[in-house]
Amino acid sequence: MDARKEGLPLETLFSDQYPQVRRWLAPFILACSLYFLLWIPVDQPSWVSALIKCQPILCLVVFLWAVAPGGSSTWLLQGALVCSAVGDACLIWPEAFFYGTAAFSVAHLFYLGAFGLTPLQPGLLLCTTLASLTYYSFLLLHLEQGMVLPVMAYGLILNSMLWRSLVWGGSASWGAVLFTFSDGVLAWDTFVYSLPFARLVTMSTYYAAQLLLILSALRNPGLKTH
């Protein structure tokens, strides 16, 4: 894929020229609002709380189906969203942490497929890797032995997704940065020490990240008009 095809500028996407974008994004915004308004305590895991948490991501799956042009890129982005929703549901229950991590790892692989591997830009990979290693070198000090391998494997995949998204550019790059930040806050709050407003920061940046990542699929003239 051509990294220059990063999608239409956001101000264009949300203009009167493309009313279908705003119309099909409304369910996502409402689902996000519902999640933050209900704010179900994390110590009360249930299928209801899992559904409420997953709803915004599932709305984005429908959004892509309704608005984005067809093709492998759109399907890969939808696959990433579905896996993310599975990961969201798993992380409701602490005992399903490994399943959630695996689901998000597959989601990032879908994003990797959507953004491609050309142009390579190894210098950018070096920069993201050095930043990731700095963070994970501190995080490793607080991980139990059984957590080291899965967390590091996930970090490697996340870093790869960040690299390719930055090469792709546009909203995808901002989405990947927010996703990485969200995961960083979540990991620090989970394994190092409790951070104030960690859940609010994590979930708000996470939902924004997913939206920005999938907006990269919207390219003119392929936008659907219904």
Curated annotation (Swiss-Prot):
Membrane-topology annotation of the record: Multi-pass membrane protein
Enzyme Commission (EC) number: 3.3.2.2
Chain ranges passing through the membrane: 24-40, 47-68, 75-93, 100-117, 124-140, 147-163, 172-188, 200-218
Keywords (A to Z) from UniProt: Cytoplasm, Endoplasmic reticulum, Hydrolase, Lipid metabolism, Membrane, Transmembrane, Transmembrane helix
UniProt record, GO biological process: ether lipid metabolic process
Intervals, Extracellular compartment: 41-46, 94-99, 141-146, 189-199
Location(s), subcellular: Endoplasmic reticulum membrane; Cytoplasm
Activation and inhibition: Competitively inhibited by lysophosphatidic acid.
Enzyme superclass (EC): hydrolase
Catalytic activity: a 1-O-(1Z-alkenyl)-sn-glycero-3-phosphocholine + H2O = a 2,3-saturated aldehyde + sn-glycerol 3-phosphocholine; a 1-O-(1Z-alkenyl)-sn-glycero-3-phosphoethanolamine + H2O = a 2,3-saturated aldehyde + sn-glycero-3-phosphoethanolamine
Protein's job: Catalyzes the hydrolysis of the vinyl ether bond of choline or ethanolamine lysoplasmalogens, forming fatty aldehyde and glycerophosphocholine or glycerophosphoethanolamine, respectively and is specific for the sn-2-deacylated (lyso) form of plasmalogen.
Subunit structure comment from the entry: Homodimer.
Protein name, entry field: Lysoplasmalogenase TMEM86B
Organism name: Mus musculus (Mouse)
